[in-house]
Amino acid sequence: LHPQQALAQTAGRPLADVVGKTLCTYSKTAKRQAANLAQTLQRASSAAKQSRQAQQLAALALAKLPDYKEAAATLLIYATHKIQDAQASIENWTGENTKLVGQAMYSSGRIDELMLLLEGHREDGANGQDKTCLGAAAGGNTVNEFVKTECDTESGHNIEADNSNIGQAATTLSQESTDPEASGGASCKITANLATDYDSHANELPLLGGLLTIHNAGGFKTGQSLQTAAPTNKLISALKNKGAGVAAKLATVTSAAPTSKQELKTLLASKGERAKLQAANDEYNNWKPGAKPEDFDAHIKKVFGAEDGKDSAYALALEGISIEVPQKPGTTESKQLYSMQPKDLMAALIGTIAEIQKAAATKAPCPKHKLTSAESDALCSKIKDANECNSKPFCSYNSTETDTAKKCQFNETKADKSGVSLPKTGPTGTEATTDKCKDKTKDECKSPNCKWEGETCKDSSILVTKKFALSLVSAAFASLLF
């Protein structure tokens, strides 16, 4: 850096090359921000598309692989989280952040044209000549041309992204303390004496919104460096103050949920990668207090049949699934699940829903359990709150009943309309165990039909009719089609 001159201007003095190079360094970074934004949006868009495909894969696995219900559901939720992450990344650019990228591009354009103008006003010849508008800070002599390379003025619309930090670039520019006017030379026509060269010119001429100023008497205004002008400069100040946040969002890399056997292997082949599934698995299990496994990695390895560095049993099971999907009009083709494109997966989901509907229509529903009077009373009588009572598909609250123990009553008509199969109850009104589970030990009590709760093996089958189950599954699948 060079010491500041006295607060006096000299008509025709050039811009100091040090200051010019600082402006160019900033401009080179600023003009790449649109490319950086395009890269970020492309990453997020691709992640969202792939994660939607992963959702469809997991939904099909949920229907086709009952032994891997928890694994498929965990990946379905994980894919949903990834879609949400991608959407959040895209939404970063719906307001001020995009405006700031535009400001960076705008400021770069203004700097480039000024620098090309100043550098172009020079005497042709070797270094040492002083007839120039962009000269050495010490002495003002002509310097080698640098604007095209330092400002990168020749780049077109297809400029490459570089992950550069616009906030840091604006800060660096704002720290330049070199006086803008070179200490020698007096031949620049652009910085001539405005007051004498024109019949009248009462005011100074600000450039770049006041980052630089041509004094009314000529030359660049001394004592006003980029450092002193930048804090209030509309071209730069917002990028200096908020550019770091923009840079952080531009650097965001949105990952996608797995859609291939290799991607599943990567996600499940190490403890660090498997840990990414914890939030999704916790959401699926909705653990009761004290029920969550202390060793998540051991749990998730068991769920997927995973081992370090190997394909998981779940991934291999997916490899064994092939489904007929439409191709040309009137024809179908059997495709392996991993090879399916989104259109194929959508057709496979529709076909799977149709299969479930057909199966539900051809199988007679399980006979309803006829409740005794004592059992029906036990289902509802312990509920005291009216809202809770009425929320049950088989209870209704009778506000006129004087006996508080009988206000919540069993409603057989409501139960029939709801389609809910009623649980058997024990002598104390608690849910009874079924014959197939009640005599099993803790080790024998296994899913999918039985579940150990407390000190008893209980029937874990879903207490809903086939029609109700179908509506839930169909709704879940249909939501993935759009």
Curated annotation (Swiss-Prot):
InterPro entries (UniProt xref): Trypano_VSG_A_N_dom, Variant_surf_glycoprt_trypan_C
Protein known as: Variant surface glycoprotein ANTAT 1.1C
Membrane topology: Lipid-anchor; GPI-anchor
GO BP annotation list: symbiont-mediated evasion of host immune response
Source organism per UniProt: Trypanosoma brucei brucei
Job description of the protein: VSG forms a coat on the surface of the parasite. The trypanosome evades the immune response of the host by expressing a series of antigenically distinct VSGs from an estimated 1000 VSG genes.
Subcellular locations according to the entry: Cell membrane
Glycosylation sites: N92, N398, N411
Lipidation (GPI-anchor amidated aspartate): D459
Main localisation: membrane
Region forming the signal peptide: 1-8
Highest classification ranks of the organism: Eukaryota, Discoba, Euglenozoa, Kinetoplastea, Metakinetoplastina
Record Gene3D superfamilies: 3.30.1680.30, 3.30.1680.40, Variant Surface Glycoprotein, subunit A domain 1 (3.90.150.10), Variant Surface Glycoprotein, subunit A, domain 2 (1.10.470.10)
Keyword Secreted among UniProt keywords: no
The keyword RNA-binding is assigned to this record: no
Record keywords, A-Z: Cell membrane, Disulfide bond, Glycoprotein, GPI-anchor, Lipoprotein, Membrane, Signal, Trypanosomiasis
UniProt propeptide residues: 460-482
Domain of life: Eukaryota
